[in-house]
Amino acid sequence: MISRYTRPAMGAIWELENKFNIWKEIELLACEAQAELGQCGITKEDAKWIRDHANFTVDRVSEIEAVTNHDVIAFLTNMAEYIDADIPEGEEKPSRWVHYGMTSSDLGDTALSYQITQALDIILADVKQLGETCKRRAFEFQDTLCVGRTHGIHAEPMVFGMKFGSWAWALKRAETRLQQAREVAATGAISGAVGTYSSIDPFVEQYVCEKMGLTPDPLSTQVLARDRHAQVMCALAVCASTLESIALQVRLMQESDVIEAEEPFKAGQKGSSAMPHKRNPITAERVCGLARIVKANAQVGLDDVALWFERDISHSGAERVAL
């Protein structure tokens, strides 16, 4: 994402600060679950100490990662620096319980699922609001006549409200698809190496997922299956196509020879450095252009489904860009 096309609320979800805060919470919840379980040696007092002292800084994590070339190890190392800072030399370090029995994928995939739900909640609210606006405008223009066109040629009369009505229904379908994708994506997995729970009790997964508002994966490997992420990206692609269709109609209606409708043009806005009379549909054009990115990223999501055996990381770099 680039700041020009990113709203602050959405951008904040994908900032390292937010990701590491989610990582921290997952690790703290896992410690509390282990203490509740009482099998590995961590006490509730240990878990409380860890929660009270755990912290990180993005700069320090980045500094450590430059050496380790492993983001999770860098994060855990920085957390341990805070957790153990007040422990006298020679005493056992509480940080030894952090990440106990977990893999990097247990942490990263569960956190990514949570980030996806955060992002989809914003998108769903916007799609719902836009659909309701289109519905309201459909009734507002239910008696406004306009020309219906097929193949771009005048066909029969219709009412302008029909356009808004069709958009409202399309957005309702988009909302349904996105909600279904959210439910599929809201899944966590803390199942240890290759997903066998050999190093961690399933109770930890259940505990963490419940606290995070996620559903435990009924059978993961060492990673969450990427068909979940692909469904999200495909739902976003269809939604983007719907928005592109609406924006394209606006662009066509704003043509100088048609001028049936136009997007707002605020005071002080300029349309051209050479032709001051121009009022261009730049917002609609931007929607059409950015829709191409979303649709292309859906292919990335589909390609990420096929991984080697119980995991590889061929999906990781692609997701850092596409998601």
Which sequence ranges carry the predicted segments?
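A glycine-rich phosphate-binding loop feature that marks nucleotide/adenosyl-phosphate handling sites
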Residues: 191-195, 264-269, 315-318
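Acidic, glycine-rich loop-and-beta core segments that form the ion-binding/anion-interacting portion
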Residues: 205-298
